[in-house]
Amino acid sequence: MTKESLLSISPIDGRYKNKNKELENYFSEFALIKTRVEVEIRWLLFLLNTKSFKFLPPTNKNQHKKIEKIYLNFNLKEASKVKSIEKITNHDVKAVEVYIVKQLESVGLSKLTEFVHICCTSEDINNLSYALMVERYRTEYLLPNLKSFNKEINKMAIKWANISMLSFTHGQKASPTSLGKEFKNFFHRISFHQNKINESKQSAKFNGAVGNFNAHHALDSKINWPTITNKFISSFNLEYSLISSQIEFKDNLVFLLSNVENLNNVLIDLSKDAWLYISKDYLKQKISSTEVGSSTMPHKVNPIDFENAEGNLTLSNSLIPAVKNKLQISRLQRDLSDSTVSRNIGLCFAYLEISLKSLNKGLKKLEPNKIKIKEELQDSWEILAEAIQTVMRKNKISNSCLLYTSDA
């Protein structure tokens, strides 16, 4: 663990950094700045490549490559320059604009500096950047991870399909089931929410300060700006929000977060059931020779991976409602209270990713205690009650259920 990790206030960037380091590429301050730079540059290039914008100075392909490199080669050193500019501007998006202007000047393209950020409000850049960050995380990381995780659940379900065992309803012995079937339940539930997350494509708007293309029409009222901006947003593989105020209404983001919240509940259920089967000695945990289960009771192998997953999933689900409820509400055409909340979107996903890794680790340690499971099943003849009273009903024996439970 690095010094920076040891000094982190949040365990996400401290204790659990190795479990969600990949999310730095999607939700860190660096990722946000880099994506803003990308959006600004791609908007400028989009304008330069659109023939109807005759007010722009002529440029060639070599110059376009120089412009493109501003975001393609963007790194931590360049991000530090943006942060230094922000100390002067006290405005994060304006700092990005100033940075790009300086970069254009440095490659001999001063003639383009006045067209950086043209027809944009900061929220055009911001909403598109956040949508892009979330969408890339959803498609590049979350969905592949879920698919891989659920594949392992299904393997366990198939492997343990023929291990018959007691089931428990209301904490009491109930009709028999199989260990594999109980894991198959979770496979199907996770698949359901995985499909919902797969449908949760993100959206963005690019229609100016109050959503009416005011500046755009001042620039050129003959251009079909909704069509132009739709084409630009679609180039990021995002859905286009034509109708908005200054802010994009975030309903697609809320849809995704709601689906993640529901998935989290299923994973909490899985964590608790695994914990309970371990406590019943139906599932054993493979012991590592170097790990310590308890500081005072060396015989113990605690189900810490499932407890860790449960705790972090609970944290994710405590944050998600706060983020959802705030981002769907904004005073009139815009207030800034959503800004600090948006910066915490990544936390909702980080706690989920920590949990998935803990669950993966915990599940790999599990093996069924076939002897214990078989002994308890064979010692529980009362669970045949359902089958017996059903056969009694078939043979038209009156009050079969009551007759079975009586002392007679």
Give the predicted meaning of each segment:
Residues 209-211, 287-291, 372-377:
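A glycine-rich phosphate-binding loop feature that marks nucleotide/adenosyl-phosphate handling sites
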Residues 246-326:
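Glycine-rich anion/phosphate-binding loop at the beta-strand->alpha-helix junction
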Residues 2-216, 220-229, 293-294, 304-308, ...:
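A helix-coil-helix interface module used to build multimeric assemblies
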Residues 226-246, 250:
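Active-site-adjacent "gating/activation" loops or surface patches in catalytic cores
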